[in-house]
């Protein structure tokens, strides 16, 4: 939604701006939640302020910094325990605003001719690279299973954000276009680089699989 004048309101904040529609709701809060034992009953959440348009330009940098801090505090060399990180960057869920650094890459000369989506992907890649670099600095990169995927098919109602060819349906449907998504996994010594697997896998199985690999109960 694009911030636009609305009768009776002097200011309409928003967190996304694909230049279509009008924001009728305030921006979402950014919550930082912790739990000493991983249970919801003992969870506390801190409101770190609204995800405004301006903040959305660098919110992924905030998220990656928190992930890196978590990794530092949970380094197995310090804790003698495995760690689990569920890292959810804002990219490429929807077209958030670009910071000056990435705005400068739009239409970049030299054959790239990047648009908003390509530049957003670059920002996401950079932040994932920071997390992988932290794992490498910890000496854990080759001892960590890294999975990269998405939660649903493309939201085709907001074309041209994505497509689902050759599948039927899209986000908010239970057709393959809404449920079947690509996935990449990195597990040195177990998954050969460049391997392609066309088998269907339910992401519901990931958590028990990872727990089992880490030595937890089956």
Regions found by a protein language model. Give the residues of each.
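Core domains of carbohydrate- and sulfate-ester-processing enzymes
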Residues: 1-45, 94-98, 157-181
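Solvent-exposed loop/turn segments at secondary-structure junctions
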Residues: 90-94, 152-155, 174, 189-191
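Metal-dependent active-site segment of extracytoplasmic phospho-/sulfohydrolases and closely related
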Residues: 79-82, 86-89, 123-159
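Active-site His/acidic residue clusters
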Residues: 47, 67-117, 155, 161-164
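A structural signal for well-ordered alpha-helical segments within the folded catalytic domains
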Residues: 58-65, 115, 122-129, 201-208
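Substrate-binding rim/cap in mid-to-C-terminal beta-strand-loop elements of soluble/periplasmic
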Residues: 2-4, 44, 129-138, 162-218
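The substrate-binding groove and active-site-proximal loops of carbohydrate-active enzymes
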Residues: 45-61, 108-123
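Metal-dependent phosphoester/phosphodiester hydrolase catalytic core
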Residues: 54, 58-61, 65-69, 76
């Amino acid at each position: 939604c694009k911030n636009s004048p609305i009768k009776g309101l002097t200011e309409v904040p928003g967190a996304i701006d694909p230049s279509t529609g009008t924001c009728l709701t305030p921006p979402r809060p950014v919550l930082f939640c912790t739990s000493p034992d991983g249970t919801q009953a003992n969870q506390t959440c801190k409101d770190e302020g609204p995800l405004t348009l301006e903040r959305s330009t660098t919110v992924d940098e905030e998220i990656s910094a928190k992930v890196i801090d978590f990794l530092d505090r949970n380094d197995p060399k310090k804790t003698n325990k495995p760690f689990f990180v569920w890292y959810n960057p804002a990219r490429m869920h929807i077209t958030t605003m670009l910071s000056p650094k990435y705005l400068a890459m739009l239409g970049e000369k030299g054959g790239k001719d990047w648009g908003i989506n390509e530049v957003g992907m670059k920002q996401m890649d950079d932040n994932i690279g920071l997390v992988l670099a932290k794992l490498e600095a910890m000496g854990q990169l080759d001892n960590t299973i890294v999975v990269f995927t998405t939660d649903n098919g493309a939201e085709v109602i907001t074309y041209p954000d994505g497509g689902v060819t050759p599948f039927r349906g899209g986000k908010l449907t239970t057709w393959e276009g809404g449920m079947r998504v690509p996935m990449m996994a990195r597990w040195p010594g177990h998954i050969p680089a460049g391997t392609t697997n066309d088998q269907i896998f339910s992401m519901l199985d990931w958590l028990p699989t990872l727990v089992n690999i880490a030595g937890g109960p089956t």
